[in-house]
Amino acid sequence: MKKIGFVDYYISEWHANNYPVWIKQANEKLGTDYEVAYAWAEQDLSPVYNETTDEWCAKMGVSRCNTIAELCEKSDVIIVLAPSDPEKHLGYAREVLPFRKCTYIDKTFAPDFATAKEIFEIAEKYGTPFFSTSALRFADELDTLKGATDLIITGGGGNFAEYIIPVGRCIEC
C-alpha cells in the first residue's frame, strides 16, 4: 500500500474532500494500491466548511501530521493542494520537493511564470518527479461543445485565474 500525504492551506476544501474517493475508484479500476494516509494544513479551520483539520482527518480516516517534514517522511507520494491559494505552492514546494518523492501540485500551479519557474528549478535541483494538471482536461462532457457558435461559460471558484481551465477547454472545442 502506497501512502499519500496531503499538504494544504486548509484541509477541508473541495479537492481534499473528493480526491480520496477518486483515488479509491482509480485503485479499483487500475489495480493500484494507494491511500490518503496523512494530512497537514497550515490553517487549522477551513473558512469554506468550518471544519478543523482534526475533524477532517477523523471523518476521512487520515492521520494528522504536525509538520510538512513529518508528512513527507511518512508518505510515499505527496499531493500539494491549496487549489484556491496558488501563492502558497512555492513555499510548500520548498519544503516537499527536497524529499525526492513523487509530488503532484494542484492547479492553479503558480500565480505567475517566475514562481512556476522556481518550482521547476527546485524539483530539478533535487531530482524530484512532479506534475500538475486539471481533471477538466479529461472532461468528456466538454467535447459536446465542439462546433458551437455561441457559448456562455459560468462556474464557481474563488477567482478567474483559478477557473480559467474550463474556459480554455471550451475555447479548445
Specify the residue positions occupied by each region the protein language model found:
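A short acidic, often aromatic-flanked loop/helix-cap motif at beta-alpha or helix-coil junctions
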Residues: 45-47, 69-74, 138-140
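N-terminal Rossmann-like dinucleotide-binding module
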Residues: 1-57, 149, 154
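Beta-loop-alpha module in the N-terminal Rossmann-like domain of NAD(P)-dependent dehydrogenases
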Residues: 30, 60-120
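Alpha-helix N-cap/loop-to-helix initiation residues
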Residues: 12, 45-46, 85-86, 112, ...
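A general structural motif
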Residues: 1, 75, 100, 127, ...
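A contiguous active-site-proximal alpha/beta segment in oxidoreductase catalytic domains
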Residues: 104, 109-168, 172
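Short, well-ordered alpha-helices that flank and scaffold nucleotide-derived cofactor binding pockets
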Residues: 21-25, 98, 121, 173
